A protein has these predicted regions:
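Catalytic center-proximal scaffold of phosphoryl-transfer enzymes
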Residues: 1-191
Length: 191
């Protein structure tokens, strides 16, 4: 379905969770650090005192660097990214003390190149939280109503939410965005 939607378009960086279906859609992938922090906290709560606590600290450091990107030079960001990669290598050499920590470390070894892409790509966020917040109303609607009775209803609802979310990004109310779209003047995201 995603391939049908994107067609030949391939984003430079795809921000995603660690789900296999989220791999390969962009030239590069940035994993959501918020999800990884949650996974690390689960490992800590399950008793890991080896890998997970240090991994949490490393992710928080990366997020802090990311928040400072506007004031840092590209060369400085590249140095920070290389430093984060070196620290990750050292962390991956630490033996986790609980099964949840071992599982987390195995998963991170498989996707280690996807953790710090955002450091050197200024327009890439460290998390996909904004996207998930945009999906939340649809998820709530589906849970409350039990879903849609027709494909037409689902498409219409998705289109309306898309117009509203795009309008919000451009400082318009839901009503303004819908009125403009229905009048044939939709807000277009620049190519």
């Amino acid at each position: 379905m995603l391939t049908a939607f994107l067609g030949e378009t391939k984003p430079d960086v795809w921000v995603a969770d660690r789900y296999a279906a989220q791999a390969g859609h962009g030239s590069e992938r940035q994993l959501c650090l918020a999800h990884l922090l949650r996974d690390a906290q689960y490992a800590v709560d399950a008793g890991d005192t080896g890998f997970a606590p240090g991994f949490q600290k490393l992710l928080r450091r990366a997020i802090a660097i990311g928040q400072r990107r506007p004031e840092l030079k590209d060369t400085t960001l590249a140095q920070y990214r290389a430093d984060l990669d070196r620290k990750l290598d050292r962390l991956l050499a630490v033996s986790p003390t609980a099964e949840a920590g071992r599982k987390l470390a195995r998963g991170i070894r498989q996707c280690r190149g996807d953790l710090f892409v955002f450091i050197t790509h200024r327009d890439v966020p460290a998390t996909n939280n904004e996207c998930e917040r945009a999906l939340r109303p649809s998820v709530i609607f589906r849970k409350v109503t039990g879903g849609f009775r027709s494909q037409w209803g689902a498409r219409t609802y998705a289109d309306a939410l898309s117009v509203i979310a795009t309008g919000r990004l451009h400082g318009r109310s839901a009503l303004q965005a819908l009125r403009e779209a229905l009048a044939g003047r939709p807000i277009l995201i620049p190519p």
